[in-house]
Amino acid sequence: MNAAEQFRPLLSETAFSTWVACFGPWIGSDWKNVSLHQAGAFFRKQLLTKPAHAHKADDEGPAWQQGARSGWLLLRGPSSEFWFDKWLAHLCSRGVQFHWQEKLHEFAYDGAKITGARLTSGLRIEADVHVLAINPFYAAEILERTPELAKLDQLCRFRALVQDGPHVQVSFRIAFAQRIRWPRPRCALVVADSEFNLTLFAEEQVWAPDVELGEGIASLWTGTSCVSSVPGQLYGLPVARCTESQFIEEIKAQLLRCGALDALIREANAGRTLATFQIEHIEVWHEWKFSPDGIQGRQPKWVNTTHTQRWQPTQATPVPNLILAGAHTRTDADVWSLEAAVESGWRAARMIEPEVRVLPQYRPAWLRLLGAFDDFLYRLGAPHVLVVVPSAVVVGLVIVAGVLLLSHQRA
């Protein structure tokens, strides 16, 4: 069931648009495709997480606590320099070899195990265990090049898994020559009235003072458009059909049109409006190729939808030395997320090293009981537990009131 459509009859037009605007920035998906299961599971995890976890101080920073509603966790600089480069150096120091600018083409399968993997360059890779941890759109193509593999249990799920296509989530940056201040720390924004479901964050709020924003740049906003099928007001075109210049003009128009955003800017900048701050440059992430025939990205992004949830494969496959990993595989996290990706990696590692421990997702006892009851109702074809329980409570109160009234009359 589509989450947005399930809530539409219950909300006003303004409340509905505000509610679904949270789906892109928070859940990381297009609100037109988000299932009720995915939305419910995501927000439940945000509200009902375990008690706060204390992180000890180390050479990277002071001690801090992570818990429900802690806010966005952010790096203190650009992702490559402050995260990926450090991990790359660490893995190389441990003996990991990377083959850059190479693509996996197919697996060699002898009917019992994987005997090797061939790259598009022709290079053959041999290993005791092969872990397929790439996005499922490419994985589906790779597996289909070896029909004997593609028809096996779990591996045969990939074509159905990607049936809804990728989620188009376009990243962009807006640079200003003057510093734009915000009324509170770590002010992250969802532009709820934007057709493209825009979300924004000003990086200078958290980046270290010695990190360069760019020559002559005092404020650097990073943003994302999360919905690709809703037409913008300026050109009447959705993201999927815009040219790059049209996309940029739509972004500017939607931001300048947002009264709530402008009110925040005026509050923190002595009454100055957003329009008075000159934009020096707007840059769209280089991997996106715009075309009237449809936008395409080099790394198609998979997310849960109303059609794909049940097709998620397990990490284990019928081939003993082929393991799957990624947020598109089945996990206890149960929704496409960084947490699911990490968990899938632990589960894949445990298949190689059985002593690896996979931490279960936290679910309170009352929620587990409620979920089991709802599963029972589903098997019976009965309404959702949130419909049945309130109805049962009302009926129970009526019965109790009737019994009390009858007892009073007899007395």
List each language-model region with its residue ranges.
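Active-site/ligand-binding neighborhood in enzyme catalytic cores
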Residues: 1-110
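Rossmann-like nucleotide/phosphate-binding core characteristic of flavoprotein oxidoreductases
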Residues: 1-26, 249, 253-278, 294, ...
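Amphipathic alpha-helical segments that form well-ordered structural scaffolds
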Residues: 6, 82-93, 246-258, 344-351
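C-terminal segments that line or cap access tunnels to active or ligand-binding sites in enzymes
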Residues: 54-75, 127-129, 134-343
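Short, hydrophobic alpha-helical segments
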Residues: 94, 126-131, 349-357
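Conserved beta-strand-loop-beta-strand element in the redox core of flavoprotein oxidoreductases
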Residues: 107-125
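Acidic/histidine-rich catalytic neighborhood
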Residues: 123, 138-140, 160-161, 378-385
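C-terminal lid/capping helical subdomain adjacent to the catalytic/cofactor pocket in oxidative enzymes
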Residues: 301-411
